[in-house]
Amino acid sequence: MSRVGKLPITIPEGIKIGLNDLEVKISGPKGELSKTFKGNIAISLAENKLLVKPLAANKNARAMWGTARSIISNMVTGVKEGFKLKLEINGVGYRAMVKGKYLNLMLAKSHNTKIEIPSDIKIEVPKQNIIILEGTDKEKLGQFASIIIKQRPPEPYKGKGIKFENQFIPRKEGKKN
């Protein structure tokens, strides 16, 4: 029995939910999200609580049960409050700036890296070495953050690179002569 899946999702005021078989549409003050789930689960709405149940007793259905509940819970949180990720850029001469619908990264390469910003994600660069990402979809936000981090992942010797705000980078000792 899934400890996550059996918990009901409480729907706060101001959030509308539309259920159409296995498609869930959630709209709120920050926007609208929809997701279609595969079989093996049943989603029902009862007095401001959303319930997710497995249709079969097999391993796949039980795994999808908790996952679907977490995804729907994140959708509700996203349309109500939104999600925010903060990235730090460490390194001499490493900078970020927003130009139009592109994020321009200067990361000690022979060229500047331009990344197109998705329409549902807002980017703010308060300082040259801090990037703040905001959006309603937690999954898309994390994927976009990983695209940015991939441009220059943090390295363990000097700590240069792009990382999440409170991410710990284990440091290594350099060569000894």
Swiss-Prot record:
Signal peptide as annotated in the record: none
Record-level Gene Ontology MF annotations: rRNA binding; structural constituent of ribosome
Function: This protein binds to the 23S rRNA, and is important in its secondary structure. It is located near the subunit interface in the base of the L7/L12 stalk, and near the tRNA binding site of the peptidyltransferase center.
Ubl conjugation among keywords: no
Subunit structure: Part of the 50S ribosomal subunit.
Entries under PANTHER family matching the protein: 60S/50S RIBOSOMAL PROTEIN L6/L9 (PTHR11655), LARGE RIBOSOMAL SUBUNIT PROTEIN UL6M (PTHR11655:SF14)
Protein family (similarity comment): Belongs to the universal ribosomal protein uL6 family.
GO biological process assignments: cytoplasmic translation
Keywords: Ribonucleoprotein, Ribosomal protein, RNA-binding, rRNA-binding
Cross-referenced Pfam families: Ribosomal_L6 (PF00347)
Protein name: Large ribosomal subunit protein uL6
Phylogenetic classification of the source organism: Bacteria, Pseudomonadati, Pseudomonadota, Alphaproteobacteria, Rickettsiales
CC annotations in GO: ribonucleoprotein complex; ribosome
InterPro entries, sorted: Ribosomal_uL6-like, Ribosomal_uL6-like_a/b-dom_sf, Ribosomal_uL6_a/b-dom, Ribosomal_uL6_bac-type, Ribosomal_uL6_CS
